[in-house]
């Protein structure tokens, strides 16, 4: 169900220069809540972005009848532990602690934690307790904000 929601939401978001970064269907509430997280990579994600996305996505979901029962649609921007995906993220969060996960062990590790110092075409760079680390981008599965300093 969530993959279908994301497939429907992505082109709606693109109309407003937004991207869908995740979706969750919380069935432990009554009525259930469908939360879709969006991000504006050109500017801070604002309430207006969420409102536009909510109105447009609601129409698409109703038309497709994804959820025949009653539900609540929430559109929000992601918080801490957010994946860094676009150039703006890597600039905005320079100096912040991040967790880098690799597809396979790189220098013996699947995970690297350090302060983000940059990203270029080839590498994501971290400072790990004063030691610079360069991880090849092709080895990286994901980069996300981390809640603890090095």
UniProtKB/Swiss-Prot annotation:
Location in the cell: Cytoplasm
Pfam assignment, any one: RimP_N
Function: Required for maturation of 30S ribosomal subunits.
Organism superkingdom: Bacteria
Keywords, ordered alphabetically: Cytoplasm, Ribosome biogenesis
High-level lineage: Bacteria, Bacillati, Cyanobacteriota, Cyanophyceae, Acaryochloridales
Protein family (similarity comment): Belongs to the RimP family.
UniProt record, GO biological process: ribosomal small subunit assembly; translation
Species the sequence originates in: Acaryochloris marina (strain MBIC 11017)
Record-linked NCBIfam families: PRK00092.3-3
Single GO cellular component term: cytosol
Gene for this chain: rimP
Cross-referenced InterPro entries: Ribosome_maturation_RimP, RimP_C_sf, RimP_N, RimP_N_sf
Main location (coarse class): cytoplasm
Name of this protein: Ribosome maturation factor RimP
Transmembrane segments: none
């Amino acid at each position: 169900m969530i993959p279908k929601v994301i497939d429907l939401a992505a082109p709606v978001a693109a109309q407003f220069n937004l991207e869908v970064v995740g979706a969750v269907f919380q069935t432990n509430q009554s009525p259930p809540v469908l939360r879709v997280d969006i991000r504006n990579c050109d500017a801070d994600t604002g309430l207006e972005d969420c409102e536009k996305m909510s109105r447009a996505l609601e129409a698409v979901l109703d038309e497709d009848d994804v959820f025949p029962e009653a539900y609540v649609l929430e559109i929000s921007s992601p918080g801490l532990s957010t994946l860094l995906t676009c150039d703006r993220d890597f600039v905005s969060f320079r100096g912040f602690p991040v967790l880098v996960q690799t597809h396979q062990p790189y220098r013996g590790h699947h995970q690297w934690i350090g302060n983000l110092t940059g990203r270029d075409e080839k590498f994501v760079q971290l400072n790990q307790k004063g030691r610079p680390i360069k991880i090849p981008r092709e080895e990286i599965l994901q980069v996300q904000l981390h809640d603890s300093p090095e």
